[in-house]
UniProtKB/Swiss-Prot annotation:
Domain of life: Viruses
Source species of the chain: Acidianus filamentous virus 2 (isolate Italy/Pozzuoli) (AFV-2)
Protein name as annotated: Uncharacterized protein ORF122
Amino acid sequence: MQVLQIVKEKAKMRQNMNFFETTIYEKYDLRDKIKPGQKFVVRQGDLIIVNYDIENPQKRGLRFARIIADRENGSVIEYFRNSHVILSGEGFTSIFHPEHGLVILPVTRDDLTFYTIDNSKD
């Protein structure tokens, strides 16, 4: 399941987000969908990816995701639950999951924050 939600500038939108009632977004290469500087939320299974900090994630049923980094052939490859693979590129980040597919985001890894649903197990 892929979800993309563009966050409006007003904080009111962020406070009303409900990550359990999002819709499926079927296009995975989001480089032409997300404009520079635009806030977004992408959900790929239990992994929630944003380019800003969510205030009080616990109140929204979220917690920070535990991302594991590994070096292979001089590159850093990151994992979430040994199923999501996070790769950094020049000005973009790719996230792959065997069931949920590939998501390409037009931001660097350093600009992303990862959350997961509070009751899920890492």
